[in-house]
Amino acid sequence: MAKLIVGLGNPGPRYAATRHNAGWMLLDAFARKHGVAIEQRGFEGLYGELRWGAEAEKVILLKPLTYMNLSGRSVAQAARFYRIAPADILVLFDDLDLEPGRLRLRAKGSAGGHNGVKSVIAELGTAEFPRLRIGIGRPAPGWEVIDWVLAPFGPDDAAAVAAALPRAVEAVECFLTEGILAAMNRYNT
């Protein structure tokens, strides 16, 4: 049995510190804490592996390199290769409807307008997979949504997201150890 943790984002230095890359930021924080290098190429992305818990369960950490709107291709390839059921895939991504740094876990649900999640749902053929959303806040007046998500965080929002990352990493650890319901009960803010 294996699990797949996916951080949604866009590749390249231009997007590295943008709001839309909050999923990658969280995946990187988890990988750093557990000494995993996410640098193997495959599944139209970069991935790394670790063993988790007393049973040394395989956990794959994946960053799709397809750009956000095609992320599902990468996720589906990795899930098929490792024979991972949707319930064992945790997708990490940004959410406009949550204040910066707020966390929300769900066992399943709609894409909520997030194109990366829409792609994952389309490629997996189901919306029945766990997800962890990281708040990035709504656009400031005068901003279009696309410009907002592809812009870097302002200083206050960057601080809020950075402060939330350790708790978000703990939420991922809880998902791996105890499952999505325990993680939801403990870490939804």
Swiss-Prot record:
One of its GO terms (biological process) is rescue of stalled ribosome. Gene3D superfamilies: Peptidyl-tRNA hydrolase. The active site is at H20. It is found in: Cytoplasm. The record marks D94 as: Stabilizes the basic form of H active site to accept a proton. GO terms for cellular component: cytoplasm. Pfam families: Pept_tRNA_hydro. This is Peptidyl-tRNA hydrolase. The lineage of its organism: Bacteria, Bacillati, Bacillota, Clostridia, Eubacteriales.
